[in-house]
Amino acid sequence: MVETMLNCDIKDIALAEQGKNNIEWALRDMPVLRSIQERFIKEQPFKGLRLSACVHVTKDTAALCTVMKAGGADAVLVASNPLSTQDDVAAGLVKYWGIPVYGYAGESVETYREHVRVALEHNPNIIIDDGCDIMATIYEEKPELAEHIIGSTEETTTGIIRLKALEEQGKLKAPAVGVNESLTKHLYDNRYGTGQSLFDGIFRAANILIAGKTVVISGYGWCGKGCALRAKGLGANVIVCEVDPLKALEAVMEGYRVMPIADAAKEGDIFIAVTGDKHVVDVEHLLNMKDGSFVGNCGHFDHEINVKGLREHAVEIKQIRPNLEEYKLDNGKSIYVIAEGRLVNLVAAEGHPASVMDMSFANQALGIEYLVKNQGKLPNKLLTLPEEVDIMIAKIKLDSM
């Protein structure tokens, strides 16, 4: 492996050796992605193409980027969250794989946005998005770049919502594959990955007992289902807040209590927002919570919990532990906010295990290949990968277990 130094904006290149070890450790547990990499090395499907990826900079996403580069892509990676970057991984990608990385843990929101603009300066043909940041920024700030784009893939429910809005407004100028719609993504990553990594983050941040607590889950999509399942397994009393009657009925059938967040606010001990929407846990809910309640977010953006509004009612904000703040409120209560209201599992922990991300990122890699192979033949709409791709990924995964 050749050591390389590139233009980048990372915390410390001296962390590269540990990052290399972590990336290789992740790849060890990603047999589907490894099999795709072997084929990409031979076929070079992305030779001559520029790739901009805006994803969480973790050992698992790094593995995906190395696979894309192995397939010939001229890749640039920027962080999709100001707090979730694993700095050793960023350094490892720069030094040992020659992939420029722009992102470091604790960067300001302004720096994060500038890094997204770096992805645009790469003038990409293909895009891997996590939250639709690159695509949305292109259409808002540099729509002329759209004519060079073959297509994009989107990892998250939140990003899918934004892409659907762009499509409805007639602004989507290139096909986009909604990876989140693939069965081998949302049935496993969203459910089993989110459920496990959420509580990994809570344990690291607060080290609290879950058994006997009342855990309130706002949102009962696949991520919410996974969070509720793991909370129940840990001995919690689970309340689900869900506006979709079909999903709410499913939650009831699973044995959970279902009620509006306004009612649940008075009963819960731990509150998790996992909807993809804004201010689902709003100021009035936060003020009505019991003294000593914990709140955390497992949706992509940090606006699901109205932390800004909560801050206006705080007489004191105290850092208790890394990734845990106590908000002493003007009503005499204290509320504990995990990871500043950003993604608990990626800020306070390391995200999902590599094994489950293996399938998600296989969909990303094959989604980009699908767009390239069908260039000029696909409508400028939000698309889903063909069923045979799901089946192939599932078969490879099963054979490895």
Name what the model sees in each region.
Residues 2-46, 77-213:
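Glycine/serine-rich phosphate-binding loop and adjoining beta1-alpha1 elements at the start
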Residues 3-6, 14-31, 46-50, 58, ...:
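Adenosine-phosphate binding glycine-rich loop
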Residues 35-38, 69, 121, 135-136, ...:
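Rossmann-fold NAD(P) dinucleotide-binding segment
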Residues 50, 65-84:
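Active-site cofactor/substrate anionic-group-binding motifs, chiefly glycine-
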Residues 55-73, 185, 189, 193-279:
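Glycine-rich phosphate/diphosphate-binding loop of Rossmann-like nucleotide-binding domains
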Residues 64, 88-90, 114-115, 136-143, ...:
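Short acidic, glycine/serine/threonine-rich loops at helix termini
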Residues 79, 126-131, 143-158, 277, ...:
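ADP-ribose/adenylate-binding Rossmann-like module
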